[in-house]
Amino acid sequence: MQGPAVNIGVLLFIPYRHMEDRILKAVRDSGFDDLTLAQARVFQRIAPGGSRLTDLAEQAQMAKQSVAGLVDELERMHYVRRVPDPDDRRARLIKIAARGQRAAEVAQAAHDQIRSEWRVHLGARRFDQLQATLEELREITDPFTATPPA
């Protein structure tokens, strides 16, 4: 007899957590061993052109003060830098610094390796279907997506 089905949210979370753990391990093993999981979760949300603190807090679903503390730590460790926001003189943008860029490159390589492993495990067709399905589901679940649902 088969037990109850595992909650779909858990099924989505398990591979995410696996990927997150492996990426953070790869980053730490590459010499960025001062980076914590909480810092990495904020760091990964920084937009290519920089992000405002309030946007990072909203996306991380954390208090602005908590994110500010993490960004302060990231800045002290030279992963990020604060620069004036060209659109608003009163605001500052958090941008990825050179050290952060090097860590991000390691993270991207680890991400690519994991995707490759999953593609082999599932097969190309099923992996592509999974990717397409998750992108479609994102349309109705991600409040930060560039294209809001119709």
Model-derived features with residue positions:
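Charged, amphipathic alpha-helical coiled-coil/dimerization segments
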Residues: 25, 72-135, 139
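Short, solvent-exposed positions on alpha-helices
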Residues: 10, 54, 125-128
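Short, charged, intrinsically disordered terminal tails
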Residues: 142-150
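N-terminal helix-turn-helix DNA-binding core of bacterial DNA-binding proteins
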Residues: 21-66
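N-terminal leader segment of winged-helix/HTH proteins
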Residues: 1-34
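Short amphipathic alpha-helical segments with heptad-repeat character
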Residues: 6-9, 13, 17, 61, ...
